[in-house]
Amino acid sequence: MTKKKSNDKNNNEKIIANNRRAKFDYEIIETYEAGICLTGSEVKSLRTSSVKLDDAHAQFTKNNELEIVNLHISEYKNNAKISVHKENRPRKLLLHRREINKIISKISKDGLSAIPLKLYFNQKGLVKLLLGIGRGKRNVDKRDSIKDREWKINKQRTFKNFNH
């Protein structure tokens, strides 16, 4: 028997890393899917999920290109010492020109930040980065989001107990 193909895009994605802290620290307004320029040893290292997205952010260069900085990809352990990559080097993001222009205008004019949300392999096996454009939350906003989350949990508990 043959398996039916699913129309769901997320079935074949293998998530490498999630930036869970970003959704707590930033109010995400828009997201973009971007490719990323990597060397062979970096891709091998990503297959073992040895990456840190915590301090990473996107910035634009003098050539009006976007690059991700402070993305820490650890050294591949089984690699020859000749082709070792730098762990924290800036990596170019691959987007269409109109998307880059949109992001750059939002970063420079509106005072928003570009934060990586998720790093994953897509259906074709290519490394993709989900880039979020957002505004930083203040402590009051963080407390409000915690209160909302706790209220939803308590509401679900009461409805669950009420139905039984």
Predicted stretch roles:
Residues 88, 95-98, 136-164:
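C-terminal end-helix/capping segment
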Residues 67, 77, 128, 138-140:
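Intrinsically disordered, low-complexity acidic/polar segments
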Residues 13-112:
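Ribosome large-subunit tunnel/peptidyl-transferase-proximal elements
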Residues 94-132, 136-138:
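Beta-rich strand-turn-strand
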Residues 1-34, 39, 147-164:
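Intrinsically disordered, Lys/Arg-rich N-terminal extensions and targeting peptides
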